[in-house]
Amino acid sequence: MHIANFTNTYLPVISGVVRSIRSFRDELTHQGHNVFIFAQEHADYIDQDPFIFRYPSLNLPTEIDIPTAIPISPFIDRLLPAVKLDVIHTHHPFLLGQTAATKAQELNLPLVFT
């Protein structure tokens, strides 16, 4: 299967959400699935794993140091139909979660929300 995960937080942030996504990604990949991660970008961070795609982000003045995704990316808009996804999974109801729901509807794909 080709599985897309949309998340408002991913590496280099360490959190329960990130750990869960990485665990699912590792196991699903081990089972032969292709897992694509769509998350916010982090300045000066370079992903080590394949199939991680980043949305532009803003660093808002908050107590936590997690950039906020700007859910607009013409590149990702073109990429999503090309990878022939089977399912979209989102981990948040807002920002990239809403983007995931919209993309699932546009591409006529099932949406999983946890």
Features from the language model and the residues they span:
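Active-site proximal beta-strand in glycosyltransferases
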Residues: 3, 87, 104-114
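Histidine-centered active-site/metal-ligand motif
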Residues: 33, 89-92
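N-terminal subdomain of nucleotide-sugar transferases
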Residues: 1-56, 83
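Structural motif
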Residues: 38, 90-91, 114
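Residue-level recognition of alpha-helix initiation/capping sites
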Residues: 12, 19, 71, 94-95
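Short, hinge-like loop/turn segments at secondary-structure boundaries
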Residues: 51-56, 70, 106-108
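An amphipathic, basic-hydrophobic alpha-helix
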Residues: 61-87, 95-102, 106
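Short, well-ordered beta-to-alpha junction loops that form the rim of enzyme active sites
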Residues: 8, 92-93
